[in-house]
Design a protein with these regions (language model features):
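Class I S-adenosyl-L-methionine
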Residues: 69, 73-81, 223, 227-234
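Gly/Ser-rich helix-loop-strand patches that form or flank binding pockets
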Residues: 1-3, 24-28, 97-153, 256-319
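Small/aliphatic-rich secondary-structure junction motif
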Residues: 1-55, 88, 158-211, 230-243, ...
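Well-ordered alpha-helical segments embedded in enzymatic catalytic cores
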Residues: 18-21, 99, 179, 225, ...
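A short acidic, glycine-rich active-site loop
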Residues: 55-70, 211-224
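Extended intrinsically disordered, low-complexity coil regions enriched in Ser, Thr, Gly, Ala
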Residues: 13, 82, 105, 135, ...
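Charged docking surfaces used in two-component/phosphorelay signaling
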Residues: 91-99, 245-253
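Short phosphate-binding/catalytic loops that engage adenosine nucleotides
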Residues: 84-85, 140, 237-238
Length: 322
């Protein structure tokens, strides 16, 4: 259950969809919504060597601060009217990413909802300094909202359609499943589990299609693995499908599956085995976030020592992969 949802804001129009999603999620979870804006304090320059028009005065800084505060409070009022929910606003000062992280920790935030757009463009808020920092330095799920244009104004369940969960066979990758279960159950979303098989042997590289002897064992193993992962979700009453695909490009396979199935939310833990361990912060993530309208639910699980024989249990104590 999400009890406190945080939505960072900088006052731009491009974040409106993310704010709308945060409001609707707060409604569904009966959660508190915290709208947080961070302002950096510029250096006050007082010198007679410059013309007055170029001087940054304390009055100017105060006026700008009050304008940001009023805009934030107006957004809070709008969110309360839209969702009849509990909304708190906070205008913090300091470096943006660390300040957001500290705020989330201080107020026991369960979910952070962020737009994929901000000043500085898409890259800054996806793989750039702010989102990248928050994901790396917290163990809080981050929902990066990047909905298809045709779904603007839709509800989250209409926007996301289905949750796509790429899994690589590692226990750490499975730590996203409890978060998926919570979100899917409250939004009535189906879940698709995906495992991408990459070629290892020469024969596999030469002919990448199922139904051939050199793929049979790997495909059977992958399906059995996804069945084990799916069992937890189905026990929670969720509708779950699974798919094993053959590809030498993990990102392309994930994006193709998302587009083909209408799964506009990709959920993943940031650590895993092989190629998937590079999904969020490597070339795979770049391709997903820059070339796809797909939103991301990203979870950075706490670092724990594991072996293949000792499955990790998340904070929700979910025995996945046993």
């Amino acid at each position: 259950m999400y009890k406190v949802i945080m939505a960072p804001t900088e006052g731009s129009d491009s974040e409106r969809v993310a704010i709308s999603v945060a409001v609707k999620l707060a409604q569904r979870f009966d959660a508190d919504l915290r709208l947080v804006r961070v302002e950096t304090t510029p250096l006050v320059i007082e010198t007679v060597a410059r013309p007055p028009v170029l001087m940054i005065t304390e009055r100017t800084l105060l006026d700008e601060h009050l304008a940001r505060l009023h805009k934030l409070e107006a957004l809070g009022t709008e969110c309360r009217a839209l969702g009849a929910i509990r909304v708190d606003t906070a205008l913090e000062k300091g470096p943006v990413a660390p300040t957001l992280r500290d705020y989330a920790r201080k107020f026991d935030v369960d979910l952070i909802v962020m737009s994929s757009h901000a000043r500085g463009g898409v890259k800054r808020m996806t793989l750039g300094s702010v989102t990248d920092y928050i994901i790396r330095h917290t163990n809080i799920p981050v929902l990066v909202v990047k909905p298809p244009v045709s779904f603007i104004g839709a509800t989250p369940w209409e926007t996301f359609g289905e949750i796509l969960v790429p899994l690589d066979g590692s226990v750490l990758a499975e730590q996203i499943l409890p978060e998926v279960a919570v979100l899917a159950s409250h939004l009535n979303l189906p879940v698709k589990l995906l495992h991408v098989l990459t070629p290892v042997t020469y024969s596999q590289k030469e002919i990448m299609q199922p139904g051939l002897p050199w793929w049979d064992t790997d495909i059977a193993t992958a399906n059995a693995y996804l069945d084990r992962c799916a069992s937890y979700l189905t026990e929670e009453g969720l509708t779950v499908s699974k798919e094993v695909v053959l590809s030498d490009n993990i990102a392309t396979a994930i994006l193709d599956c998302s587009a083909r199935t209408g799964a506009y939310l990709i959920a993943i833990a940031t650590r895993g085995n092989g190629g998937m361990s590079r999904l969020l912060f490597g070339s795979v993530a770049d391709e997903i976030t820059r070339n796809s309208p797909t939103s991301l639910l990203v979870f950075h699980p706490k670092r724990v020592a594991v072996t293949d024989e000792t499955p990790v249990r998340s904070e929700a104590q979910v025995p996945v992969g046993t």
